[in-house]
């Protein structure tokens, strides 16, 4: 297999998601390469059931929902809290839905950690990107950012658990930091930079 056959040369890519926060991040990441973003919604493709046991498996399930006549990318990501055995992890979005929203989910996670005998607020954000070409070949790239959860959540930037998470060596949550900076330094961007190094080097 020659990686030169898997360079992104076209100027349009489908993001396999209905999550507007993710779509906006991908828009920023791909804007440098002047690549237009389409979404599952644009193609009238419903969200798929995430039956995988890992971020990578779910990311692949999502990207496979896009027909091969489109270049496609998918992200599966989540918050992993160390003392909670890496929960909510791959269930991050579903956990929030079950709790009645992101704020309720953050409140419950913080409460679960706080009531431990020796509370440890260490956490990480994880992202796995899957890139699928027209022949069905899929490449996956992972990104992680270590940090901690904090209470109360702060800031209105970003989405999901962003106001709840402070990266290592930082004092602001992802909800407080300037959005343009966050997008270029978060877990998704770590994975994207690995992808770009391989597939976008000629752009």
Where are each of the predicted segments found?
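Anionic-ligand binding patches
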Residues: 2-14, 21-203
């Amino acid at each position: 297999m020659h990686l030169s056959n898997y360079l992104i040369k076209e100027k349009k890519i489908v993001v396999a998601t209905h999550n507007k926060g993710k779509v906006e991040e991908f828009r920023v990441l791909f804007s440098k390469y002047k690549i237009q973003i389409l979404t599952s919604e644009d193609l009238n493709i419903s969200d798929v059931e995430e039956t995988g046991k890992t971020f990578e498996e779910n990311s692949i399930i999502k990207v496979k929902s896009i027909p091969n006549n489109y270049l496609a990318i998918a992200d599966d990501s989540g918050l992993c809290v160390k003392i909670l055995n890496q929960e909510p992890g791959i269930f991050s979005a579903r956990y929030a839905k079950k709790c009645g929203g992101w704020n309720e989910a953050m409140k419950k996670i913080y409460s679960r950690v706080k009531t431990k005998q020796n509370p440890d607020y260490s956490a990480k954000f994880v992202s796995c990107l899957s890139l699928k070409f027209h022949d069905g070949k899929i490449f996956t790239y992972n990104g992680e950012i270590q940090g901690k959860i904090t209470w109360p959540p702060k800031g209105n930037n970003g989405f999901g658990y962003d106001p709840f998470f402070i990266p290592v060596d930082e004092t602001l949550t992802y909800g407080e930091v300037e959005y343009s900076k966050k997008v270029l330094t978060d877990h998704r961007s770590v994975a994207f930079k690995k992808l770009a190094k391989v597939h976008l080097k000629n752009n």
